[in-house]
Amino acid sequence: MTTIGTPLTPKATKVMMLGSGELGKEVVIELQRLGVEVIAVDRYANAPAQQVAHRAYTISMLDGEALKALVEKEKPDYIVPEVEAIATATLVELEQAGFTVIPTAKATQLTMNREGIRRLAAEELGLPTSNYQFVDNFDDFKRAVEKIGIPCVVKPIMSSSGHGQSILKSVEQIPSAWEYAQQGGRAGAGRVIVEGFVKFDYEITLLTVRHVHGTSFLAPIGHIQIDGDYRESWQPQAMSAVALEKAQAIAEKITGALGGRGIFGVEMFVCGDEVIFNEVSPRPHDTGMVTLISQELSEFALHARAILGLPIPDITLISPSASKAIVVEGKSTQVVFGQLAEVLAEPHTNLRLFGKGEVDGHRRMGVILARDISVEKALEKARRAYDKLEIAL
C-alpha cells in the first residue's frame, strides 16, 4: 500500500530533485499536488524548480562528496535526477546504501554519456542505430570522419540541448566541428561520438512510462530541432502501424534494460516502416512539454505517479496539440515578456514562462502550447501566438 505523509512533518514523503530546470519545475508541481515534500538542487541559485520547491540547495552536482553530504542530511525517500551532469558513481553508492534513485542509478550512469547508452543499445541489445565511432583526440577524429563518411553528426559524449553538436558537411568543417564539440561538453573537453548521418522522414520521441503495473506508451511526438535543440513538437505524430509497433518494441527493450520506474524519452528516426534508435533520457523530455496541453495527465504527472508507485490505468490524449519553444537571444538579467493578452487570445492556447533569471547568447525561456482539430492547425495556432509575443531585454 502506497502512503504519502504530510510535507514539513517528520512523516513527510520526500523527493530530492537533482537539477532544477523547467522540466524539473513541472515535476515538482505535480509532486506537490500529491502532498510530497520536495527539495530542489542545482548548480546555480533560483533555478526554475527551486522557485517552487519546499527547500533549495545550490551545489556542484558533479562534486560527489557534496552530493552525498546533502543526501545524507535530507534523507529523501526518492532521488530524482533531472540532468546528466551528476556524480553518477555517488548515486550508485547511495543506491547501494539503501536510497532509491529514479529510475535507477545504473540508468542515470549509462545515459549521462552517449557512449554508455549507445553501446548498450547497439552492442548488447542489438537495436538498430546509425554507424558510430568514439574518439579521444583530433587525429582519431579525422580518421573516424573518413571511415563514417560525410555528412556525419558530431557530438560530445556528455551534453544536452544540442550543446557541442553539429552536422559535418565538408572536409573544411572538420577542425571547427571538433572544436565546437570540445567546447560544448558538459564535463569540459574530451571524448566525442561521430555518427553516420541517417536519412529519415521524421524524428519522434516515444515517451515510455515504467510503472508498478508494467510499461505504457504515450502517443508518438514529432519534433523539429535546430542543432540538436528542440524548437517545436506536436502530438500525435502520424506513423504507420508497422513503424509504431517497431518503435514501441525498441522503447520497451531499452527502458527494460535500464530498469526502475519513471518516464523515459526515447528518441528515434523513422524512414517509412523502418525505425532507428537514437538516444534515451531516463526523465521527462523537452519535446514532451506538448503533453501539458495534449493529455489528461502530462509527462510530468505520469512521472510523479510512477516515482511514487501509483497506478497509471490509462493515458488519454485529449486532442492533437503542438508546442513552440520561446528562445530568447541576447544578454539580459531582466527579461520581460509582453503582449500576453494577445498571445492567449485564441481558445485552447496556453503559455509557460520558466522564470530563468538571465540569458547570455540564446536560452529557452518558455513554451507556447496549443490544441486544435489537427496537428497542423495546432502548430499554426502556436506559431500565431508566438508571433504576437514581445520580448524586452
UniProtKB/Swiss-Prot annotation:
Listed InterPro entries: ATP-grasp, ATP-grasp_carboxylate-amine, ATP_grasp_subdomain_1, PreATP-grasp_dom_sf, PurT, PurT/PurK_preATP-grasp, PurT_C, Rudment_hybrid_motif
- E.C. no: 6.3.1.21
Reactions listed under catalytic activity: N(1)-(5-phospho-beta-D-ribosyl)glycinamide + formate + ATP = N(2)-formyl-N(1)-(5-phospho-beta-D-ribosyl)glycinamide + ADP + phosphate + H(+)
Name under which the protein is recorded: Formate-dependent phosphoribosylglycinamide formyltransferase
Q: Which residues bind Mg(2+)?
A: E267, E279
Q: Name one GO biological process term.
A: 'de novo' IMP biosynthetic process
Binding site residues for ATP: R114, K155, S160, S161, G162, H163, G164, Q165, E195, G196, F197, V198, E203
| Top-rank EC class of the record's enzyme | ligase
UniProt feature coiled coil, ranges? none
Task: State the function annotated in the UniProt record.
Answer: Involved in the de novo purine biosynthesis. Catalyzes the transfer of formate to 5-phospho-ribosyl-glycinamide (GAR), producing 5-phospho-ribosyl-N-formylglycinamide (FGAR). Formate is provided by PurU via hydrolysis of 10-formyl-tetrahydrofolate.
Domain ATP-grasp, residue spans: 119-308
Mention one GO molecular function. magnesium ion binding
Q: Which organism is it from?
A: Pasteurella multocida (strain Pm70)
Presence of keyword Hydrolase = no
The family line of this record is: Belongs to the PurK/PurT family.
Keyword terms, alphabetized = ATP-binding, Ligase, Magnesium, Metal-binding, Nucleotide-binding, Purine biosynthesis
Residues that coordinate or bind N(1)-(5-phospho-beta-D-ribosyl)glycinamide = E22, L23, E82, D286, K356, R363, R364
The record's subunit annotation is: Homodimer.
CC per GO annotation: cytosol
